[in-house]
């Protein structure tokens, strides 16, 4: 198998530009130049049109797999959204990928110590938009110390199941869960929270740059 690392990018660009790049490239290989094919080297820019592709994952079909996205993780598919506005194109792509996008509700936050400072302005933004913030004890204390009203949820390791029950009953709209890189156990609270979110189709973020 030869994979030039463009198996998904080329189809995306073909849809966005209207040019069948695989056909064009094949003809070039066979000796037919772009000029002979009547194609300009520079594709004409389409005015006021944004195309966005987002990854799609199959965590719900893979039992016991941690939904944390490590650097080597690869998506199992992609979805495309397009619109005259970038924000709407992103929104459409997220919806097409199967993500539930809510404008209000409750966010459950479980942030690794190394990520707390970076996460602070993101959580504050959700709070300012009117979202209810729930967090495990350590994260909740950190957010409260920065004047973000946060409801404390008991850790699973303490014997409580209130977090999982809340997710299963549809009381949580988003889960933001990051982990310490040296902790990968399936016995951790974070792992169990992420699996519960996946199994109940709750939108989850494991990387802060995605939240941004």
What is each of the regions a protein language model found here?
Residues 154-155, 160-212:
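Peripheral docking tails and interdomain loops at the edges
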Residues 86-92, 111-115, 132-135, 154-164:
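A general structural motif
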Residues 118, 124-125, 138-141:
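Phosphate-binding active sites in nucleotide-utilizing proteins
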Residues 130-142:
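Short internal beta-strands
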Residues 5, 112-114, 179-183:
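Short glycine-rich anion-binding loops that position phosphate/pyrophosphate groups of nucleotides
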Residues 1-103:
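ATP-dependent carboxylate activation and anion-phosphoryl transfer catalytic cores
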């Amino acid at each position: 198998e030869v994979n030039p690392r463009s198996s998904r990018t080329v189809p995306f660009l073909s849809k966005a530009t209207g040019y069948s790049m695989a056909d064009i490239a094949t003809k070039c290989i066979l000796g037919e130049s772009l000029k002979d094919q009547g194609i300009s080297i520079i594709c004409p820019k389409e005015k006021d049109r944004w195309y966005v592709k987002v990854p799609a994952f199959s965590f719900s079909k893979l039992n016991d797999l941690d939904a944390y996205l490590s650097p080597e993780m690869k998506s199992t598919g992609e979805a495309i959204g397009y619109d005259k506005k970038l924000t709407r194109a992103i929104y459409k792509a997220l919806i097409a990928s199967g993500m539930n996008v809510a404008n209000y509700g409750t966010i459950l936050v479980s942030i690794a110590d190394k990520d707390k400072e970076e996460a602070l302005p993101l959580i504050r933004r959700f709070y300012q938009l009117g979202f209810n913030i729930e967090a495990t004890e350590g994260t909740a204390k950190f957010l409260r110390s920065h004047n973000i009203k946060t409801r404390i949820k008991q850790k699973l390791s303490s014997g409580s199941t209130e977090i999982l029950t809340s997710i299963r009953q549809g009381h949580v709209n988003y889960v933001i869960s990051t982990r310490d890189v040296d902790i990968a156990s399936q016995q951790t609270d974070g792992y169990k929270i992420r699996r519960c979110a996946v199994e109940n189709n709750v939108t989850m973020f494991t990387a802060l740059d995605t939240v941004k």
